[in-house]
Amino acid sequence: MRFDVFTIFPGMFTGFLTESILKRAQQAGLIEIAIHNIRDWTTDKHRTVDDTPYGGGPGMVMMAPPIVHAVESVLGQEQNSTPIIIMSPSGELFTQDIARQLACFPRLALICGRYEGIDDRVRIILRARELSIGDYVLTGGELAAAVVIDVVSRLVPGVIDPESLAEESHNSGLLEYPQYTRPPIFRGLGVPEILLSGNHAKIAEWRRMMALCRTAARRPDLLARAALTPRDHELLQRCPPDPFAHQGPVYEGDQLERPEGGEQGASR
């Protein structure tokens, strides 16, 4: 999959795109990310990309010509088949479902706004979709575009283990259950005993219960949309008073950390 990013600050993406999973995905040829400087499509010696808003008001507005020319030049004949996204606080909320939709395309264009926004004719001419990553305002669309790239890239086949994706928050419609690893005791807090039992059926049920309970406590809107089974409703009746409190045993005394091994070794 290819991402084309249009920005006036291309340097903002350098570190983010050259580390961790995104770096490996690019090296493996699973994704390609191209950063385009909108100023390269300006026509004056000052490489101007903004001007004062018609009707008055504070700040500056990004001009339509450089952005439209940049997108049309880069996308060429693929413009009509490529989703064009404008990152904007007034856009629809970016969700995991939208990410799954976008991941089905071989190419995605992301336009990063700045200042007071982008001339609305850009959206109309390019038939662009406006997306927001949350109910807050950033100084520009670059961080938001990076979020979209990260989320969508994870859904490209081969980038992430499919089993890992299935267990993550929002992919199942619920928040994820709490995770633990070694050591089995740290600062007096022990791993929930069910996770050390080796009983995979009970572990799976506990994890499902905790996912349900955490979603009910923190994101009831997600729970209302989830397809719940009769067993899920039974598990919801067993929710602890605070599903975000520590769910394992608590130890007192000097031995606040216990080494690996023995009966308390993590079940794998």
UniProtKB/Swiss-Prot annotation:
Chief location category: cytoplasm
GO molecular function, one term: tRNA (guanine(37)-N1)-methyltransferase activity
CDD domains (UniProt xref): TrmD-like
Keyword Lyase: no
SUPFAM superfamilies xref list: alpha/beta knot (SSF75217)
E.C. number: 2.1.1.228
Disulphide bridges, residue numbers: none
Any Gene Ontology CC annotation: cytosol
Alphabetical UniProt keywords: Cytoplasm, Methyltransferase, S-adenosyl-L-methionine, Transferase, tRNA processing
GO process annotations (BP): tRNA N1-guanine methylation
Enzyme class: transferase
Subcellular localization: Cytoplasm
InterPro entries: Alpha/beta_knot_MTases (IPR029028), tRNA_m1G_MeTrfase_C_sf (IPR023148), tRNA_m1G_MeTrfase_TrmD (IPR002649), tRNA_m1G_MTases_N (IPR029026), tRNA_MeTrfase_TRMD/TRM10 (IPR016009)
Sites where the protein binds S-adenosyl-L-methionine: 113, 133-138
Catalytic reaction(s) noted: guanosine(37) in tRNA + S-adenosyl-L-methionine = N(1)-methylguanosine(37) in tRNA + S-adenosyl-L-homocysteine + H(+)
Region named Disordered: 238-268
Summary of subunit composition and partner proteins: Homodimer.
Role according to the record: Specifically methylates guanosine-37 in various tRNAs.
Family per record: Belongs to the RNA methyltransferase TrmD family.
Protein name according to UniProt: tRNA (guanine-N(1)-)-methyltransferase
Gene source species: Thermomicrobium roseum (strain ATCC 27502 / DSM 5159 / P-2)
Phylogenetic lineage: Bacteria, Pseudomonadati, Thermomicrobiota, Thermomicrobia, Thermomicrobiales
